[in-house]
C-alpha cells in the first residue's frame, strides 16, 4: 500500500535542558558566561557530585561527556566541567512558549515530549513544494531563536518517522530533509542503533546476525528479521528501515479521551479507615488502568483521581505530568498524591466530615506509544530520584501487601488483589 504524501515537520530543541538553564542564568546575571559556550552540563547534585548527566553543552561533548553517564565519570573526562542543577519550572516555561509558537503554524500539532513536536503542514505547503518547506522551516527556527533565545532543529519529510530521523542529523540550528528517495544515501549508512524505535536490545540481537547498519536491516529478508525479533517487531524494523510509516500527526483533540477504572465500596471510607481500605484499592485500580493502556498500546499524560460521597456527589482532582506514561507505579504515585490533596488536605473532604463510597483512577490525554518516546524531562527526574524511589518502593509494597491481607480478612478473600 502506498504511503500518503504529507508535509511533516519534526521540531526538536537543541540541548533543551542545558539551553534553558543557560537562558535563565543569563536573565538573572547578564554578565555571566553562557553555559552553551563552555563545557557544562545539567544533572545530579552539584555539591555532592552524585547523580547522572541529563544534558550537556556542545563543548562538553568534545570531551566525551555523555547524557546518562554518572557525574563522577563526566568530571573525570572534563575536570573543569561546570555543573548546574535541574530547574523543572524553567523547563516547563520554555516548553509552553515553544508550543505556543508552533501552534500558530498549524492546528495539526502533536507534542511528543517537553522539547519536541510533530507538525502536519500539508494544508499550508503542498508535499511537492519542497522549497517552500525549507523556507518555512527556516522561519520557524528564526522565530524561536529571536523570540525565545534558544535553537531548534527541524526535520522535514513525508512521514513522521523520516522527519524524526532527519531532525537528529547534524546540530545545532539546522534544517534537514529525509524524503523517501533520500533514505538510501542519508539513512541506510547509519548504525542500526540509530534507527528510531530500535532499542539497545533489539540492535544487539540484529548485530549478532550481521545486521550492523539501517541499510542491512532494510535489505534483510523479512523472515530473518521476524525469526530474530518476533513477527511484530521484525515487521516494524523492516518497515522503519525502509522509511515506511503510516503514523499520523494526532492533535490532542483527536486522541482517545481516557482510560479509567472505578470501584464502589460496601462501606464508607473516612479518615479512620483510609489507610487500610482506600490505599489497596487505589493500588489495584492503578494497575488495572496501566494494564489497559499497555494492551491498547497507549500512554497518557493527565492522571485523575475521583470519588463519590455517601450522598452521591462526585469530587475529583487531576494533574498533568511532564511525560507520557503507562506505568502502574507512576499512575499510582500520582493518584495517591491527588487523593491526599482531595481527602486529607486542610480543605479535604475528610476535614469536612464527608465520607466516600466510590474511588476511581483515570488517565487521559492519550497518544499511541509507537511514536511516543520517553520524555527527557521525566527521565531526568527519574534518574535524580532513582535511589530514593527504590527504597520507598520496597517499604510501600510491604505495607500494601499487609493492607491487602487485612482488607481481604475483613471482607473476604479476593476482595482486593494485585491487578493482572
Question: Language-model features: where?
Answer:
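Gly/Gly-Pro- and Ser/Thr-rich, intrinsically disordered tail segments characteristic of DNA damage-repair
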Residues: 1-239, 383-420
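DNA-contacting surface of Y-family translesion DNA polymerases
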Residues: 2-3, 10, 194, 204-353, ...
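Short, charged/polar surface micro-motifs in flexible loops or helix N-caps
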Residues: 14-16, 46-49, 310-313, 366-369
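Acidic, metal-coordinating catalytic segment for phosphate/diphosphate chemistry
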Residues: 20, 323-420
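Short Gly/Ser/Thr- and Asp/Glu-enriched loop/turn motifs at secondary-structure junctions
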Residues: 112-116, 157-160, 254, 298-302, ...
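Short loop/turn motifs enriched for small/polar and acidic residues
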Residues: 122, 157-159, 308, 359-366
Amino acid at each position: 500500500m502506498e504511503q500518503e504524501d504529507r508535509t511533516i515537520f519534526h521540531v526538536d530543541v537543541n540541548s533543551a535542558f542545558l539551553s534553558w538553564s543557560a537562558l535563565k542564568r543569563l536573565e538573572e546575571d547578564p554578565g555571566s558566561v553562557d553555559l552553551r559556550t563552555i563545557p557544562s552540563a545539567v544533572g545530579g547534585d552539584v555539591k555532592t557530585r552524585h547523580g547522572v548527566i541529563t544534558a550537556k553543552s556542545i563543548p562538553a561533548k568534545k570531551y566525551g561527556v555523555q547524557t546518562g553517564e554518572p557525574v563522577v565519570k563526566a568530571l573525570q573526562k572534563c575536570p573543569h566541567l561546570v555543573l548546574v542543577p535541574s530547574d523543572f519550572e524553567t523547563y516547563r516555561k520554555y516548553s509552553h512558549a515553544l508550543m505556543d509558537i508552533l501552534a500558530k503554524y498549524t492546528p495539526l500539532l502533536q507534542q511528543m515530549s517537553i522539547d519536541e513536536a510533530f507538525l502536519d503542514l500539508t494544508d499550508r505547503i503542498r508535499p511537492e513544494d519542497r522549497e517552500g518547506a525549507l523556507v518555512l522551516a527556516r522561519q520557524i527556527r528564526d522565530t524561536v531563536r529571536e523570540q525565545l533565545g534558544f535553537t531548534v532543529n527541524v526535520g522535514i519529510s513525508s512521514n513522521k518517522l523520516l522527519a524524526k530521523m532527519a531532525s537528529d542529523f547534524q546540530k545545532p540550528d539546522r534544517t534537514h530533509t529525509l524524503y523517501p528517495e533520500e533514505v538510501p544515501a542519508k539513512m541506510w549508512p547509519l548504525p542500526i542503533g540509530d534507527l528510531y524505535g530500535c532499542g539497545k536490545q533489539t540492535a544487539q540481537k540484529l548485530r549478532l546476525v550481521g545486521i550492523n547498519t539501517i541499510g542491512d536491516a532494510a535489505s534483510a529478508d523479512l523472515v530473518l528479521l521476524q525469526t530474530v525479533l518476533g513477527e511484530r517487531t521484525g515487521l516494524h524494523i523492516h518497515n522503519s528501515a525502509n522509511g515506511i510509516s503510516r503514523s499520523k500527526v494526532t492533535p490532542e483533540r483527536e486522541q482517545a479521551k481516557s482510560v479509567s477504572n472505578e470501584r464502589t465500596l460496601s462501606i464508607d471510607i473516612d479518615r479512620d479507615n483510609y489507610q487500610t481500605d482506600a490505599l489497596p484499592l487505589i493500588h489495584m485500580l492503578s494497575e488495572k488502568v496501566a494494564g489497559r493502556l499497555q494492551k491498547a498500546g497507549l500512554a497518557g499524560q493527565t492522571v485523575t483521581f475521583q470519588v463519590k460521597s455517601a450522598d452521591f456527589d462526585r469530587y475529583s482532582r487531576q494533574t498533568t505530568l511532564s511525560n507520557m506514561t503507562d506505568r502502574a507505579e507512576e499512575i499510582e504515585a500520582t493518584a495517591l498524591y491527588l487523593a491526599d490533596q482531595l481527602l486529607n488536605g486542610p480543605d479535604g473532604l475528610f476535614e469536612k466530615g464527608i465520607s466516600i463510597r466510590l474511588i476511581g483512577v483515570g488517565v487521559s490525554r492519550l497518544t499511541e506509544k509507537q511514536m511516543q518516546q520517553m520524555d527527557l524531562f521525566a527521565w531526568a527526574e527519574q534518574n535524580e530520584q532513582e535511589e530514593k524511589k527504590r527504597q520507598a518502593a520496597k517499604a510501600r509494597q510491604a505495607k500494601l501487601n499487609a493492607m491487602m491481607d487485612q482488607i481481604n480478612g475483613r471482607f473476604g478473600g479476593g476482595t482486593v488483589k494485585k491487578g493482572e
